[in-house]
Amino acid sequence: MAENFATFDDITYCGQEAEEIFVKNLYSSDLKGYGIRYMGGVKGKKQLMSGEVSDLYQAYSCPFSPKGKATLEESFIEPVKIKVNLEECYDSFWDTFMSKQTEITLNGGIPQTFFNWFFDNVMIQELKKEYEDLFWNADKAYTGDTREYLKLGDGIVKQLRGATGSTKVTGVALTVANVLDKIGEVAAKVDELENDVEGYKIFVNYKDYRKMLTALGENSPLTVAVWSNFTREGDKVYAYGMEVVPCRIDVNTIVASHPMNLILGYDVADSEIAYKIVDMRDKTMDNTFRVGIISNIAMGVVYPSTAVVTTAIA
C-alpha cells in the first residue's frame, strides 16, 4: 500500500499561478505549432466578421466613381466552461512514481513530490491531448461511450461540415490503397478556391498519416523523396505543395485550410481557472487523492468558405 511513504501537502493553483499554467500549456500545445490562431479574452459569444475587397481598378476619369466589390463573411465563437473532477487511488500510480524518482535520484537529480510528479507528468499531458481533441472533434450530438467530453461543444470539423460556404469532399474509410487519392481530391478542391492558398495545410489523423507514408513507400523505390504530387522535406511531407500535418483530428477526416483561419479561443483574465490536488487520507480515510480543475475553451472558423473538409462517413 502507498500510505505512510510520504506526507503530502495539497496543491492549489489559482489566480495568476493558474493563468500562467494554463497559458504555458496552451503555447506548448501542438496546435500552436500548427499555426492555429489563438484568441484570448473570449468571455462570451463573439462575432467573427471578416471582409474582402476585389475588382478595385478602373479606367481613370475626373469624377469620383465608386467601383469594386466587398464581401463580408461572419461566424461566431463561444467559450465553453469545462472542468475535471477526478478521484484516484495512490496504488494505481505509486510504483511508477517510485521508479521515476529512483531513476532521478540515481542520476543526481532532485526527486519530485508525488503531487508535483502526477500534475506535471500525468495530468497536464492528458489535459493537453483532450484539449486538442475538443478543438478538432467536439460535437454536441456526439453519442459515443468514450470521450464523453466531446459533447461539450462543436469543434472545427463539426463547424466546417455544418457551414454552407465550406467545400465538402465525400468522406471514406481511409486505407493505404486510397489515402493518396483522397488527399489529392481534397487538394484539387483547394485549387478551385478563389482565394490565395499560400500557407494552406492539410490536417489528418496520426493513423491516416502513417497510412499515407506507407502508401508513399509502396509507390517509391529505395529512398526517393519525390513522388507524383508529393514531396518530403526533412520530417515533413507536402502534398500538392501543402504540408500534410498529423494531428488529433478524428480518423478518416481531412481538413484543408490556412491554419490562421482556425481559431482557438480562451479566457484567463477574471476567469475561474484553477488547479487543485487534495489528499483524501486524512479526510475520508480512503487511500485516494482528488483532482479538481476549472478551465475553458472556444473554437471557431473565420472564413468557412476558404476551407475544405471531408464529410462524415454514412
Regions found by a protein language model. Give the residues of each.
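Sequence/fold signature of self-assembling virion shell proteins
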Residues: A2-L56, L150-L174, K211-A314
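Assembly/oligomerization interface modules of large self-assembling protein complexes
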Residues: A18-K100
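Helix N-cap / beta->alpha transition motif
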Residues: N85-F93, K100, N205-D208, S257-P259, ...
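Active-site-proximal structural scaffolding
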Residues: L86, N116, I202-N205, T284
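Short helix/loop capping segments that flank catalytic or ligand/cofactor-binding pockets
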Residues: T96, E132, K211-L213
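Alpha-helical scaffold segments that mediate packing/assembly in large oligomeric complexes
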Residues: T102-E185, T310-A314
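Extracellular structured ligand-interaction cores
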Residues: D120, V197-G199, T288
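Ordered core of a single globular domain
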Residues: L174, L180-S220
